[in-house]
Amino acid sequence: MIFSTLERILTHISFSVVSIGITIYLITFLVDEIRGLYASSERGMTATAFCLTGLLITRWVYSRHFPLSDLYESLIFLSWSLSIIHKIFDFKNNQNHLSAITAPSAFFTQGFATSGFLTKMHQSRILVPALQVQWLMMHVSMMVLGYAALLCGSLLSTALLVITFRKVIRLFLKRKNFVHVNGSFCFSEIQYMNEKKNVFLNSLSARNYYRYQVIQQLDRWSYRIISLGFIFLTTGILSGAVWANEAWGSYWNWDPKETWAFITWTIFGIYLHTRTNTKWEGVNSAIVASMGFLIIWICYFGVNLLGIGLHSYGSFN
């Protein structure tokens, strides 16, 4: 009774704190001058990470197994992983515009975990015999850590594409407006326009330099985080194959979860391969990573929606 009450308290506190933190992030993202609010939001994310850690430990002690046996527990662990990656990311690179991209991931994941869709899973249950092995901790934890890192890296790549294509659209519209300028202007008007253009170009060059720095940071950090996630994902797939061989006598069975895990691994393997070619860095590799963002969610939730295959124990039903 005490553990279940403590679990509910930690769940509500973690979601409330991360909700307030996301609101502060949005304010500081729009109004960059308010530095004190950014520090408060980071303290909120730290508190969220501690609450989620306490929640996982409480559920572990109460259920007597590592909390990764169903969709609810894996979502809590995913939210914890996202918050930890966010804190590491913020420690290495203290930039509020990058933190504002990674922080909402923990918010939406935690929000879905505590929603009414998974109410039946909030109560801890006894593990089925197939899951009462040490491979559960090794395999599932590596997979979820891989999902968390790949999701963060994919979000950074998506942000890179948004910034880049927004710039391209603006340049296209400006060039189009320049073509439609009336040719009946006198010399003084043209000279006045050139002077305004020079002032505009000076301010634009500073803005472009800042945008270039942001794009470079997004590209660099997305590559680093995706590389880390790919290592976790590979370790999770290999440990799962060994576990499957011990449990079912076959390393690979091509059920829905395994198939989509292989597709996810292939997509991000292609991404890392494109990074070896300097011509494919930046936008081209970011497109591949953005595709991977959708693939990860299909892999993570697809089998839970279908409720079939060897991994159907984590379905909604």
UniProtKB/Swiss-Prot annotation:
Pfam families: Cytochrom_C_asm. GO terms for biological process: cytochrome complex assembly. It is found in: Plastid, Chloroplast thylakoid membrane. The keyword Thylakoid applies. Disulfide bonds: none annotated. InterPro entries: Cyt_c_assembly, Cyt_c_biogenesis_CcsA, Cyt_c_biogenesis_CcsA/CcmC. The chain crosses the membrane at residues 9-29, 46-63, 71-91, 98-118, 143-163, 225-245, 258-273, 286-306. Belongs to the CcmF/CycK/Ccl1/NrfE/CcsA family. This is Cytochrome c biogenesis protein CcsA. It comes from Citrus sinensis (Sweet orange). The gene is ccsA.
